[in-house]
Design a protein with these regions (language model features):
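Metal-dependent catalytic neighborhoods of phosphoester/phosphodiester hydrolases
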Residues: 1, 16-25
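Glycine-enriched alpha-helix->loop->beta-strand junction motifs that scaffold or abut catalytic
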Residues: 2-4, 28-29
Length: 319
């Protein structure tokens, strides 16, 4: 778009420390900024404008420390009142009538529900890997356990806060990762070629060379199988070497597999809500010291990106 000098990005999940220069068809440069998610930073740009022209800029990401900022009385009052609200049968958590409300929560305040301590994190719990994160692995493991599925899918959401090793995992932390209006889960049978098609389609949404055809988000999170991805290949050629972990055998196009997942936007499934499945999984699998053992993160192998600086520090295999 011609005539724009700067775009201050407001919808992002990655803090970008310096503006990105983008050249338009006329040769002019537009500076694009993004300051990250969850209120961690405020993007601050000082512009030197003289004679009707932009002469220069100074940009920084100012960190936000909540213990250095005075609480807004009106907001604190609102949050306190909300925390005192009592959960009842009029609460609607699910689009499925079976799970409109949770009987186990009736009579408890919102604060009591959200502050429940579930287990202690033994390692960093994070969401924002391009292909997988430890929170994602936990969600996929919970789905696989709930439904005894061969494969589990979880959306590549780009939000959710991290927990440090040794911190308690509370119900609020689980909700931070799962709280959407379409949290119902499902179990269904799929042929191997359908599973491969899902992986290929999501990968195309992310890595389509034409940015106007990209859908955003991260790669779908997968439990129960491993695969190799070539981001720079074309649709239908990006996903290879797909192996079912439980059998250590290749995915077969016409074989049928049990697949679990959640976050269906259209016709809603009727399964339990994902946050209850994750909560129950944590409570069942923590040890006597309240520590939750975490399964190894199922990072895919990435092909053809070794020299790409954006993949620096990748915890999976690069070939």
């Amino acid at each position: 778009v011609s005539g724009l000098d700067t775009i201050l990005g407001g919808h992002t999940h990655d803090g970008v420390p310096l503006p990105i220069p983008v050249t338009n068809p006329e040769g002019a440069v537009c500076l694009v900024t993004n300051a990250g998610s969850n209120g961690k930073f405020i993007g601050v740009m000082d512009m030197d404008i003289r004679d009707g022209q932009l002469k220069g800029i100074k940009y920084e990401m100012a960190p936000v420390f909540d213990n250095l900022i005075k609480d807004a009385p009106e907001m604190m009052s609102y949050l306190t009142d909300l925390g005192r609200r009592v959960y009842d049968e009029n609460i609607v958590e699910s689009r499925s009538k079976t799970y409109h409300y949770n009987k186990a929560r009736i009579g408890k305040t919102f604060s009591q529900i959200l502050n429940e301590k579930l287990a202690i994190a033994p390692d960093l719990l994070y969401r924002r890997g391009n292909f997988m994160g430890s929170w994602d692995q936990l969600i996929c493991s919970a789905l696989t356990y709930e439904y005894s599925s061969d494969i589990s899918f979880s959306p590549g959401f780009r939000w959710g806060t991290s927990l440090l090793p040794g911190q308690w995992i509370t119900m609020q932390d689980v909700m931070n990762q799962c709280a959407v209006t379409y949290g119902e889960t499902y179990i269904q049978e799929m042929k191997g070629k359908q599973v491969l098609g899902i992986l290929e389609q999501v990968a195309d949404n992310l890595f389509e060379p034409d940015s106007y055809l990209q859908s955003g988000g991260d790669m779908v999170r997968v439990g129960g199988l491993k695969y190799t991805i070539s981001p720079e290949s074309e649709l239908g050629e990006r996903i290879t070497d797909v192996v079912i972990l439980s059998s250590n055998k290749p995915l077969v196009a016409n074989d049928v597999y049990k697949v679990s997942g959640w976050a269906v936007v259209g016709d809603h499934p009727s399964g339990r809500l994902i946050w209850d499945i994750v909560k129950d999984y944590i409570l069942r699998h923590k040890n006597n010291e309240n520590i939750l053992p975490l399964e190894p993160i199922n990072h895919p192998t990435i092909k053809g990106m070794i020299s790409n600086e954006g993949i620096s520090g990748y915890q999976g295999e690069l070939i």
